[in-house]
């Protein structure tokens, strides 16, 4: 299975160690989403924009670990999207974004510019 990551799980980011058993397939940008800073990590929500990230091939054990990290407390929900590498899971932020900083470029690597 595949997963699209756009923040701290990306290469050389704070939580990239969770992806050590994953195979990077390539970069991908998804339209109709906006990226917000939650502090040390981002949240993507449906909206007018594009979010940039990476697609990985992962195993069931890695997905279970990521679900435990991302979906506890209802902060994110996993959603199936289509990528050039095939369908992939994406974690979509589930809480209100009012008061959060919009990352206008849609790229978490640009977060220090906002």
Swiss-Prot record:
Domain of life: Bacteria
Protein name: Gamma-glutamylcyclotransferase family protein ytfP
Pfam families: GGACT
GO cellular component, one term: cytosol
Similarity comment text for this entry: Belongs to the gamma-glutamylcyclotransferase family.
Job of this protein: May play a role in antibiotic biosynthesis.
Compartment list: Cytoplasm
Originating gene: ytfP
Primary site of residence: cytoplasm
Molecular function, one GO term: gamma-glutamylaminecyclotransferase activity
CDD domains: GGCT_like
PANTHER family reported for this sequence: GAMMA-GLUTAMYLAMINECYCLOTRANSFERASE, TROPONIN C-AKIN-1 PROTEIN
Record carries keyword Phosphoprotein: no
Keywords tagged on the record: Cytoplasm
InterPro entries registered for this protein in UniProt: AIG2-like_dom (IPR009288), GGACT (IPR039126), GGCT-like (IPR013024), GGCT-like_sf (IPR036568)
């Amino acid at each position: 299975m595949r997963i699209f990551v756009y923040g701290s799980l990306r290469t050389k980011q704070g939580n990239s160690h969770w992806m050590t058993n994953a195979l990077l397939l390539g970069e991908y940008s998804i339209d109709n989403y906006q990226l917000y800073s939650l502090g040390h990590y981002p949240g993507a929500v449906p909206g007018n924009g594009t979010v940039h990230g990476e697609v990985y091939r992962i195993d069931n054990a890695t997905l279970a670990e990521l679900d435990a990290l991302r979906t506890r407390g209802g902060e994110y929900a996993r959603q199936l999207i289509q990528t050039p590498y095939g369908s992939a899971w994406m974690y979509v932020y589930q809480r209100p974004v009012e008061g959060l900083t919009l990352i206008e470029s849609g790229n978490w690597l640009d977060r220090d510019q906002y």
